[in-house]
């Protein structure tokens, strides 16, 4: 019995070994065969983003949420409309009207795709497919552009129109089904992140060009940001005026001319008077620095959309050029030029060592105009508790550079602009100061005969890239979260005297200076 038992045990061990060997062979076979197949990236886009280097510089966005935990790299600028398509706009009679026929093809169920929530990839929502217009943040394929160009320029009775529209409708329905699932999935993943980012739809951009947008068309998170700022009311805004939007562009211009007073801290009001500030501030007010003013002026926004614009020579041809914050010219001359006459800087520039305010050439040999958010009451006790303490570096700079014109804007001027924006907007706007861009436009309108503003209202190169010199993507930089940017841009669009083609191609708005236009008597305006 014992030999048989021993043989039985040996047989069992041999069987177990054989099964193990067979399992190992099968496992190796399948793993080898899978490795021969194309394998998707071993990291999701979100996981890969965590491996990207973080942005080194602090972003100079007054009041913006600062969260450098994500970064995004996109090859080139995210262009919304191809030049071939734009050429068709220009050449065809009634082409703008035909563009409205395409709006539905560009529109998803929302005016704003929340496809950058948490600065996550657009490809998280939309598959990369050449047949999809601007899918996943990629440029449209050449064939797709040719089809659209043919569609726009075709005759009204061309049967290809209905075929193409039907094809787009079918693709759109398929995309919506997959998008809803992807969108809900991404929203679930990003519930713990409170950023406010979205990507502009093509129909929204077109409506912005026409001045026909509202906050209801924004991404839900941007809408939530606006509601949060309204409820927080950090600056104690108590608006007592009336809201309407009935003024024409010319009437709005005259309203601004009548009421805007570019006021700076002159050292004569308390507490500055008791601190001896009269000896620190320039003796000549900003408005009288150039007695005859300027002829033509350029206001150059720092928006990423100005990349690849080749506007540098045109910008430098102006008599004066205004730039903002830490926006450089070196290395970007082809797109932004190199002339700088004035630079508007917010208080973060003076206080954050990363901006090298003390020793950078950006802030030398130019007029400097600084500002800091103050209470709506414009109480100058704000000196004791500014958002960022710009006063100490200001005095230090004035002592070292007494001949350089350097001003601090009076809170009364800043909130005066806010009042005018709110009075001319039906909706309640964010109770926060206007953007540096809007402030700069109004300052130059008071000093120049004509003002050319570049990429304030975005061109066809519109992108979520905040600044042309920083790798940071945020749709709030274009439409506003903290600042009432959307409403500012609608006012500027209303006053635009430039060509529509310049707006589409260059992102250029032309505004008359206050001294160049004679306005009628104030009682001719409708009551505010």
UniProtKB/Swiss-Prot annotation:
Keyword entries, A-Z: Disulfide bond, Glycoprotein, Glycosyltransferase, Golgi apparatus, Membrane, Signal-anchor, Transferase, Transmembrane, Transmembrane helix
Intracellular or extracellular location(s): Golgi apparatus, Golgi stack membrane
Topology, Cytoplasmic side: 1-10
Chief localisation class: Golgi
Cysteine-cysteine disulfides: 254-519, 297-448, 466-477
Bilayer topology: Single-pass type II membrane protein
Any one biological process term the GO annotation gives: protein glycosylation
Annotated catalysed reactions: a beta-D-galactoside + CMP-N-acetyl-beta-neuraminate = an N-acetyl-alpha-neuraminyl-(2->6)-beta-D-galactosyl derivative + CMP + H(+)
Ranges facing Lumenal side: 32-528
Pfam families: Glyco_transf_29
Glycosylation (residues): 167, 308, 338
Enzyme Commission numbers on file: 2.4.3.1
Residues spanning the membrane: 11-31
Keyword Transferase: yes
Gene Ontology terms, MF aspect: beta-galactoside alpha-2,6-sialyltransferase activity
InterPro entries linked: Glyco_trans_29 (IPR001675), GT29-like_sf (IPR038578)
GO CC terms in record: Golgi apparatus; Golgi cisterna membrane
Gene3D superfamilies xref list: Glycosyl transferase family 29
Function: Transfers sialic acid from the donor of substrate CMP-sialic acid to galactose containing acceptor substrates.
Family affiliation: Belongs to the glycosyltransferase 29 family.
This protein's name: Beta-galactoside alpha-2,6-sialyltransferase 2
Organism: Gallus gallus (Chicken)
Higher taxonomy: Eukaryota, Metazoa, Chordata, Craniata, Vertebrata
Gene coding for it: ST6GAL2
């Amino acid at each position: 019995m014992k030999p048989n038992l021993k043989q039985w045990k040996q047989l069992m061990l041999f069987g177990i070994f054989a099964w193990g060997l067979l399992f190992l062979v099968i496992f190796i076979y399948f793993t080898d065969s899978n490795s021969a197949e194309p394998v998707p990236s071993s990291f999701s886009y979100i996981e890969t983003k965590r491996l990207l280097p973080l942005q080194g510089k602090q972003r100079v966005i007054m009041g913006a949420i600062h969260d450098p935990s994500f970064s995004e790299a996109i090859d080139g600028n995210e262009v919304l409309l191809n030049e071939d398509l734009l050429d068709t706009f220009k050449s065809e009679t009634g082409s703008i009207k035909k563009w409205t026929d395409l709006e539905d093809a560009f529109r998803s169920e929302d005016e704003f795709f929340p496809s950058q929530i948490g600065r996550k990839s657009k490809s998280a929502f939309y598959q990369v497919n050449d047949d999809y217009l601007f899918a996943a943040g990629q440029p449209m394929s050449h064939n797709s552009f040719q089809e659209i160009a043919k569609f726009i320029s075709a005759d009204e009775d061309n049967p290809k129109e209905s075929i193409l529209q039907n094809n787009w409708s079918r693709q759109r329905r398929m995309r919506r089904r997959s998008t809803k699932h992807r969108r809900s999935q991404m929203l679930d993943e990003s519930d713990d992140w409170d950023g406010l980012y979205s990507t502009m739809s093509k129909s929204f951009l077109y409506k912005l060009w026409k001045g026909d947008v509202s906050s209801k068309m924004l991404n839900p998170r941007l809408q939530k940001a606006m509601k949060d700022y309204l409820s927080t009311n950090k600056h104690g805004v108590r608006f007592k005026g009336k809201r309407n939007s009935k003024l024409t562009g010319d009437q709005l211009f005259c309203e601004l001319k009548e009421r805007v007073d570019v006021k700076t801290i002159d050292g004569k009001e308390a507490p500055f008077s008791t601190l001896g500030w009269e000896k620190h501030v320039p003796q000549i007010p900003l408005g009288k620095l150039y007695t005859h003013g300027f002829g033509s002026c350029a206001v150059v926004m720092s928006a990423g959309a100005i990349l690849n614009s080749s506007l540098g020579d045109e910008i430098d041809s102006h008599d004066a050029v205004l730039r903002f914050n830490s926006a450089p010219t070196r290395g970007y001359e082809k797109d932004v030029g190199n002339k700088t006459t004035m630079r508007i800087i917010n208080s973060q520039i003076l206080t954050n060592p990363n901006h090298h305010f003390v020793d950078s050439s950006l802030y030398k040999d130019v007029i400097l105009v600084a500002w800091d958010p103050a209470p709506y009451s414009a109480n100058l006790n704000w000196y004791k508790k500014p958002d960022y303490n710009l006063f100490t570096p200001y005095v230090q700079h004035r002592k070292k550079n007494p001949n350089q014109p350097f001003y601090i804007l009076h809170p009364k001027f800043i909130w005066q602009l806010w009042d005018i924006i709110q009075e001319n907007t039906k909706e309640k706007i964010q109770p926060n100061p206007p953007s540096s861009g809007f402030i700069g436009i109004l300052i130059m309108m008071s000093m120049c005969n004509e003002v050319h503003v570049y990429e304030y209202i975005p061109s066809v190169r519109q992108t979520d890239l905040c600044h042309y010199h920083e790798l940071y993507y945020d749709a709030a930089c274009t439409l506003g979260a903290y600042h009432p940017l959307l409403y500012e841009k609608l006012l500027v669009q209303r006053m635009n005297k430039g060509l529509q083609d310049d707006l589409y191609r260059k992102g250029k708005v032309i505004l008359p200076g206050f001294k160049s236009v004679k306005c009628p008597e104030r009682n001719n305006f409708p009551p505010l």
